[in-house]
Structure formats: structure tokens, C-alpha cells
Amino acid sequence: GQQIDQGAGVETDLPRDYLEFAALEFALNRDMPVLGICRGMQLLNVSFGGSLIQDIPGHIAGEDGSSQVHFTYVSPGSKLAAVLGGGAIYRVNSRHHQGLKDPQRATSLLASAYMPEDGIVEALESPAHSWVIAVQCHPERAKEVPTNFQNLFKGLIDWASRFKQ
């Protein structure tokens, strides 16, 4: 598979890649709930056979650690829209230099959000799994995203509490 870069100027960490691909495969094979964030969304896409755009200018964090911001369109009817309370245009943070557009998307994954200005996919989900959602933004940086993005963590906890091996 393709290597997942950790950021501009950061060396690829193959042991980390192998560990994360193995952990994701373990979870997917058991239909465990998965929430991918940033690199996690990229990892999900590559693990399903997709690829990445290796360098996307204008999406990485500033030198002072601040996030870039942009609008993302969440598709109505998607799992992500259900978690967020509806499809809409949301203002989110951006801290990544890799990503994907529809041509790089794994065909078995659905793009459930994208950036209208440049077509960068901002969220993926797997229709073959109960709860596999991945977002390019960082919802853990709560002050930089709408409050309903915290529902991603609530949804993960809810699905994890129902998970039976």
C-alpha cells in the first residue's frame, strides 16, 4: 500500500504505518466501530485501495500552531450527517498536507463530505460496516469546529458500548 506521510518535513514511520494498518484491519474484520481523524481518514482510504494526493498547499497548520479553516459540505443522508444532526455546510479546521479527491477515493468507501472550493474529500464512511466514519478535520480541537462535531466521539462511544465480539 501507499505510505502515509506524517507531515511536511517529517520522515515516514514504517513501523507506525504497519501497526496502524494492522489495527484497522483487526477492527474492520470484526465490524468494530472506527473513527478516523486526519491521518486516520487517509489510512482508511489507502487500506481500502485508494491513494493520496501527496501535498496539498494551504491546508497545513501555521507555523504558530494555528489551524487553517475552511467550509466543508456534509452530504445529507450520510452516516456523518446523521451523527452531526443533518447535512449542511460547516466551518472546520484544516491541519493536513495530504488528502484525496474523488479520483483517489477507494471505490468501496463513500465520500460523505468535501470542500466545495477544491473538491478535497473531507469525510469517508464504509457502507459495508456498522459504524466506520473518518474525517479530515480535527474535532478534538473543539474550539475550532462546530459543537455538533463532538457527536462523533459520542457516536463512537455509543457504538463501542454495543459492540460484542
Tell where the protein language model's regions lie, with residue ranges:
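Conserved G/P- and acidic residue-centered "switch" motifs that form tight phosphate/ATP-binding loops
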Residues: 38
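Acyltransferase
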Residues: 135-165
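Catalytic nucleophile loop
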Residues: 41
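Beta-strand-turn-beta hairpins that frame and shape the catalytic cleft
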Residues: 127-132
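Hydrophobic/aromatic beta-strand patches that form the interior of the parallel beta-sheet core
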Residues: 35, 112, 133-135
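Pocket-forming structural segment of enzyme catalytic cores
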Residues: 48-122
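Flexible gly/pro-rich beta->alpha loop and the following alpha-helix that scaffold active-site loops
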Residues: 1-35, 48-49, 53, 154-157, ...
